[in-house]
Design a protein with these regions (language model features):
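N-terminal secretory/targeting leader peptides
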Residues: 1-4, 82, 110, 133
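Short, glycine-/small- and polar/acidic-enriched structural segments
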Residues: 1-61, 66-69
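Phenylalanine-focused residue identity feature
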Residues: 7, 19, 37, 44, ...
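Pocket-lining segment of extracytoplasmic ligand-binding domains
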Residues: 12-14, 22-23, 89-160
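Bilobed "Venus flytrap"/periplasmic-binding protein-like clamshell domains
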Residues: 38-109
């Protein structure tokens, strides 16, 4: 896609990968890329259904988890988190590839136990899950996440 656009919007991790050539699809570095401004932080969150007994990353094991639709920011970040924790989709009881507009309803309807979401705060989809059906944002403060943030300048911790 190099040269096809004059202006675009991207998440900081994908901008970093495009500039440095570190994307998973092995695209060459594009060092003419420039950042104009940062719109707002988009912390990655995992929202767990009330009654699912999910409190942290370890308790996702064996659960029904939406990892995001292919090509989405939440899917990309979820894959990075799985790799950092040394697991793949087999770690979960089942995975789904719902879009961000589908996942809150699926959580409240008990079709999934949790979903990951890379989004600015506040967000209506997260509010639908937390206010509408008692879901909660789980703690992602693990050693693997601490190392991931320390090793990657485009990630930062956020408190919600």
């Amino acid at each position: 896609m190099q040269g096809e656009l004059q202006f675009g919007v991207a998440q900081s991790d994908w901008q970093y990968h495009a500039y440095n050539g570190t994307r998973p699809d092995k695209v060459k570095p594009y060092d003419k890329l420039r950042a104009v401004f940062s719109a707002h932080p988009e912390p990655f969150q995992i929202i767990a259904r009330k009654g699912s007994k999910i409190k942290d990353w370890k308790s996702l094991k064996g659960k029904k988890v939406n990892i995001g639709n292919p090509g989405s920011g939440q899917r990309g970040t979820f894959e990075v988190l799985m790799e950092a924790h040394g697991v793949d989709t087999g770690y979960f009881g089942a995975t789904s590839e719902l879009t961000s507009s589908e996942q809150s309803g699926a959580l409240c309807d008990k079709k999934i136990d949790a979903f990951g979401y890379t989004v600015g705060v506040p967000n209506a989809g997260v509010a639908q899950s937390t206010d509408g059906c008692g879901a909660s944002i789980i703690n992602l403060d693990t050693g693997a996440v601490k190392k991931l943030v320390a090793d990657n300048p485009f990630y930062a911790f956020a408190t919600i």
